[in-house]
A protein has these predicted regions:
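Terminal amphipathic helices with adjacent charged low-complexity linkers/tails
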Residues: 135-137, 141-177
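Short acidic-hydrophobic, aromatic-tinged amphipathic segments that line or gate anion-handling sites
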Residues: 89-93, 152-164, 341-346
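Glycine-rich, anion-gripping cofactor-binding loops and their flanking helix/strand elements
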Residues: 23-136, 238-263, 267, 279-281, ...
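Thiamine diphosphate
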Residues: 228, 233-393
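Active-site donor-nucleotide binding/catalytic segment of nucleotide-sugar enzymes
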Residues: 13-29, 191-198
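Conformationally flexible catalytic loops at phosphate/diphosphate-handling active centers
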Residues: 1-14
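Short glycine-rich anion-binding loops that position phosphate/pyrophosphate groups of nucleotides
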Residues: 25-27, 51-52, 116-119, 223-225, ...
Length: 393
């Protein structure tokens, strides 16, 4: 039976003025609006993992094209028309949370987790550093999705059920506004990646989000790709649905999964590194036999770029054991499987190529050569968010 009486349900969250919501992968797209309405009433910021698809939704009164907080977007010509816009969704958290001085300032009274834990290591470390915080974990199976071991209340419920039964209105927006100011600063900084003159994963993602059709679906590969999306795929700028294969063997079947998505005949994209593509190259054969359409955005840095950011960097045999360069010519792979192929040498070429490929059938590989070490430097440059602590306090 329901262990919470109606009175207890109303009191559970009413006692907290600072509630933080974590929205991770494995949230059904049909439940996103419930999370949104729940958070708005609670004045609770949502740290939305890109694979949660909570970033797809916005409601009037958020951040305009100049990254300014606006109070009424009905009269704001800079806002995207006919889109729901929300100011509770936070998408640039992994950048500004690099400043650990923010962690105690952003400490809530209560954390609510929907779906799996977010991919951001900084968010996990920040939450793990907080003591005496209620941590409510919601999932329909009672499987623990919280690797930090911070859960104080584990509730078996669907998201729709929980957000309906435990809805409460919070009159104080002070905590939410603190996160919103950081989001403005984060977007202002990260958006400058679109001006990067060299091929860079961050610029690709910004271009992709702005130029693919709203009804698109994107499979996001593992390793650095999903983490780059965490940085550069902003809230409220696309209705595209993001998918991912997360887990220990998440690299398995990347191409095949993307082609499976393409069977619904929606515009479908795969954004991947070279190792993930190489791992499931034979999956391309399925496209021809089933007449499937797929655009593959291949960032080819000839190896595993994520290890440039990990402690293994600089160790003996690093390139051989971790970077695992393959030195493959993917134009040959495209020819082998009957795919279209374009290799770009300048980021300015991407948008015209995307437009051209959208009118073609079959699989098309757009190869973007990048450099692992230089990408790491650019990553540091574009994700360095300056925070005014005095204004925040």
């Amino acid at each position: 039976g329901d262990v919470f009486s109606y009175q207890n349900r109303s009191l559970l969250l009413a006692q907290y003025k600072r509630v933080l919501i974590l929205a991770g992968p494995q949230i059904d797209v049909d439940e996103v609006e419930s999370i949104h309405s729940f958070a708005e009433n609670l004045q609770a910021p949502i740290l939305a993992d890109p694979l949660s698809n909570v970033r797809r939704y916005h409601k009037a009164g958020a951040i305009d094209d100049n990254h300014e907080v606006v109070s009424n977007c009905n009269n704001d010509t800079n806002m995207t028309q006919d889109k729901q816009v929300s100011d509770v969704v936070i998408s640039t958290y992994d950048a500004f949370l690099a400043d650990k001085e923010l962690w105690p300032v952003l400490k809530p009274d209560c954390v609510i987790q929907f779906g799996q834990i977010v991919v951001s290591k900084r968010v996990q470390q920040m939450v793990a550093s907080w003591d005496n915080v209620e941590y409510i974990e919601i999932n329909p199976t009672m499987d623990s999705m919280n690797p930090m071991g911070k859960t104080t209340i584990h509730m078996q419920a669907s998201i729709d059920m929980f957000t309906h039964l435990f809805a409460v209105k919070n009159e104080s927006n002070a905590y939410l506004n603190r996160w919103k100011r950081l989001e403005v600063a984060g977007k202002a900084q990260l958006s400058t990646a679109i001006e990067e003159p060299s091929c860079f994963e961050g610029r690709t993602i910004r271009e992709l989000q702005q130029h693919i059709p709203d009804n698109s679906q994107v499979l996001v590969a593992n390793s650095m790709t999903v983490r780059d999306f965490d940085y550069f795929w902003f809230s409220g700028e696309s209705d595209a649905v993001l998918y991912g294969n997360r887990g220990v063997n998440g690299i398995d079947g990347t191409v095949s999964t993307a082609l499976g998505l393409a069977t619904n005949h929606q515009p479908t994209y795969l954004v991947t590194g070279d190792l993930s593509l190489f791992h499931d190259l034979n999956g391309l054969a399925v496209a021809k036999t089933h007449n499937l359409n797929l655009t593959i955005i291949l960032h080819n840095n000839d190896g595993g770029g994520i290890f440039e950011y990990l402690p293994q960097k600089g160790t003996k045999y690093f390139d051989y054991l971790f970077s695992t360069s393959q030195g493959l010519d993917y134009s040959g792979a495209a020819k082998l499987y009957g795919c279209g192929y374009t290799k770009i040498s300048s980021p300015d070429e991407l948008v015209p190529v995307l437009a051209k490929v959208s009118e073609e059938s079959g699989v098309h590989i757009i190869e973007i050569p990048t450099d692992r070490e230089y990408s790491r430097q650019l990553h540091r440059k574009y994700t360095n968010v300056s925070v005014d602590m005095e204004a925040l306090l």
